[in-house]
């Protein structure tokens, strides 16, 4: 504890936000309130130990400038630099004497360790770290490749935490990503406003994969996302039931109808085939690139580009027209082969995002290999494979009926915006 305590104890006087457990200076307040949560702050005065943050200000600034990927997204980095580093860091109060609950300061038991010092140090102490002995787990897992944390606690993770590590002589995490919120309009979720919806309630009404899809797809990289029942249902019907669900259902149904459920060989080449194959097999590299930069929503868009291209391929090749002429049956077989192979690739790509849906698709088309590596090759599906029954992946929702049902159950107006909370208390 003393290793990081650069300045001896003194008297702290400033503004304290109890919900955020944060101290603020007069100039940092916004309209006299906490700049993070907007709640009232109270004047605090007590004896405390201080961490001389300014000693490391230039070092941290140099690190951020030489490691542009350290704080992401870029807008968050600018916020930390312009709002905290450039104005000059204040000494950080790292102990409290106004209460007794918490971890006592070892060399001065009358002081309790400030909660954020305790919380942040857990990243390494949980791995067995001590200044005297690092430990096997610490050497294996630290530094972390990425901290993914809420944007409201970015200051603690990109200023306090790096400086703590610098003071200890330990490496910094390679990247800190401040993820956005799922908002109610332009505000955070609030129980007092009655606008909270729990993830398990969404799952009960829409299924877990639909919730996964919405949460991952509707959360932009750098901006807050929003959710309403209306938009959720619209996405469910358009993206899942129609775009994806109809593609799988139509393809399996046509194979059952025209070839008694048996996948034909794909050796009668025609127009549009090459473009479909290129889009399907090229998706994985684009997805990996997006995921490596934490653009999760954009990575899902790459999957839906394959889905959209497959639906367009159906319109271009008109298999129902080919089925009318016996001479066109070989070409029809190839068209359906190309579709089912594209669907196999889609199922593989979805396996990390929507695992239940991926499994259902694989069962319907008789696919075994859903590895990411297999998506780079077009032609893994074996001719002669039997498809299953064409069962809808997602049943369309009657929006008016479902909204009324939700209003009755949760007592919320149909047009009220809501947020996802992970678990009930």
How should each PLM-predicted stretch be described?
Residues 11-15, 25-37, 289, 293-294, ...:
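Basic, alpha-helical terminal appendages of large translation-related enzymes
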Residues 31, 66-68, 108, 131-141, ...:
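Short, glycine- and charge-enriched coil/turn segments that flank and shape catalytic ligand pockets
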Residues 2-6:
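Short, small-residue-biased leader/transition segments that mark boundaries at the very start
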Residues 19, 36-37, 43-257, 299-303:
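Structured secondary-structure scaffolds
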Residues 220-223, 227-231, 236, 251-273, ...:
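Long, amphipathic alpha-helical stalk/connector segments used for oligomerization, subunit docking
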Residues 7, 24, 41:
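Cys/His-rich microdomains that often coordinate metals
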């Amino acid at each position: 504890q003393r290793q990081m305590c650069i300045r001896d104890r003194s008297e702290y006087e400033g503004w304290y936000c109890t919900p955020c457990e944060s101290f603020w200076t007069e100039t940092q307040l916004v309209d006299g309130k906490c700049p993070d949560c907007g709640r009232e702050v109270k004047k605090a005065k007590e004896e405390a130990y201080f961490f001389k943050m300014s000693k490391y200000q230039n070092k941290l600034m140099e690190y951020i400038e030489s490691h542009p990927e350290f704080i992401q997204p870029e807008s968050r980095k600018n916020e930390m630099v312009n709002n905290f580093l450039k104005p000059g860091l204040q000494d950080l109060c790292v102990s409290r004497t106004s209460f007794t609950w918490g971890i006592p300061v070892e060399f001065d038991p009358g002081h309790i360790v400030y909660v954020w010092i305790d919380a942040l140090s857990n990243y390494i102490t949980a791995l067995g770290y001590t200044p005297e002995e690092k430990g096997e787990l610490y050497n294996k897992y630290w530094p972390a490749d990425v901290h993914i944390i809420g944007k409201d606690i970015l200051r603690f993770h990109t200023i306090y935490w790096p400086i703590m590590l610098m003071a200890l002589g330990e490496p910094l995490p390679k990247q800190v990503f401040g993820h956005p919120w799922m908002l109610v309009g332009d505000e955070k979720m609030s129980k007092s406003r009655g606008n909270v919806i729990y993830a398990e309630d969404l799952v009960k009404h829409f299924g877990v994969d639909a919730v996964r899809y919405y949460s991952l797809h509707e959360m932009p990289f750098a901006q807050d996302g929003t959710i309403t029942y209306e938009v959720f249902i619209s996405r469910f019907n358009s993206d899942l039931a129609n775009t994806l669900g109809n593609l799988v259902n139509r393809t399996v149904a046509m194979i059952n109808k025209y070839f008694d459920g048996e996948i034909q060989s794909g050796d009668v080449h025609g127009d549009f085939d090459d473009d479909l194959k290129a889009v399907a097999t090229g998706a994985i590299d684009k997805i990996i690139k997006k995921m490596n930069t934490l653009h999760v929503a954009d990575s899902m868009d790459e999957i839906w580009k394959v889905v959209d291209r497959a639906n367009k391929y159906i319109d271009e090749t008109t298999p129902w027209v080919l089925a009318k002429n016996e001479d066109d049956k070989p070409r029809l077989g190839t068209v359906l082969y190309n579709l089912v192979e594209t669907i196999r690739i889609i199922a593989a790509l979805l396996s990390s995002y929507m695992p239940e849906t991926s499994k259902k698709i694989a069962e319907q088309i008789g696919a075994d290999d859903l590895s990411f590596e297999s998506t780079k090759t077009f032609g893994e599906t074996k001719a002669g494979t039997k498809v299953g029954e064409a069962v809808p992946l997602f049943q369309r929702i009657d929006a008016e009926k479902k909204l009324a049902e939700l209003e009755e159950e949760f007592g919320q107006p149909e047009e009220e915006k809501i947020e996802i909370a992970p678990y009930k208390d």
